[in-house]
Amino acid sequence: MIYRLKKNFEFTIVYKRGKSFANELLVMYILKNRRNKDRDFLAYSKVGISVSKKVGNSVVRSRCKRLITESFRLNYNYIVKGYDFVFIARNPLQSKSYFEVERAMRSLIKKAGLYNNEEITNTPN
């Protein structure tokens, strides 16, 4: 299950405090998440997706969001948990295939040092 960033303030916190990584298709912001009162880190990651109206009409923007969501979902078990991710689609993304989007996302996550080649399973503490 993918947990989503939904509120505007959640996106704003990641933009202001997080680190950014970019390539031709995507911009990625990451921030280690802290949700509990005692400041423990969550055992899961959350993702938010932003696609500007400059990218295309609503059909194109929805396709971009679906491609990003599916790429994240299929790679979720290889990503280090406990981070908030915000992905921003750039204009060239609208004409790319799923495999190109997945390759771009994976390269950004590897650049951030959050990608493991081995599958990570959630183990309770």
Swiss-Prot record:
Residue ranges annotated as transmembrane are none
Assembly, in brief, is: Consists of a catalytic RNA component (M1 or rnpB) and a protein subunit.
Task: Write out the function statement from the record.
Answer: RNaseP catalyzes the removal of the 5'-leader sequence from pre-tRNA to produce the mature 5'-terminus. It can also cleave other RNA substrates such as 4.5S RNA. The protein component plays an auxiliary but essential role in vivo by binding to the 5'-leader sequence and broadening the substrate specificity of the ribozyme.
Q: Which domain of life is it from?
A: Bacteria
Q: What is its EC number?
A: 3.1.26.5
Which Gene3D superfamilies did the record assign? 3.30.230.10
Q: What is this protein called?
A: Ribonuclease P protein component
One BP annotation, GO? tRNA 5'-leader removal
Q: Give a yes or no for keyword Nuclease in this entry.
A: yes
Q: One Pfam annotation, family name?
A: Ribonuclease_P
InterPro entries found in the cross-reference section: Ribosomal_Su5_D2-typ_SF (IPR020568), Ribsml_uS5_D2-typ_fold_subgr (IPR014721), RNase_P (IPR000100)
Family, per entry: Belongs to the RnpA family.
Protein source organism: Clostridium beijerinckii (strain ATCC 51743 / NCIMB 8052) (Clostridium acetobutylicum)
Molecular function GO terms recorded:
3'-tRNA processing endoribonuclease activity; ribonuclease P activity; tRNA binding
Per the record, the gene is rnpA
The UniProt keyword set, sorted, is: Endonuclease, Hydrolase, Nuclease, RNA-binding, tRNA processing
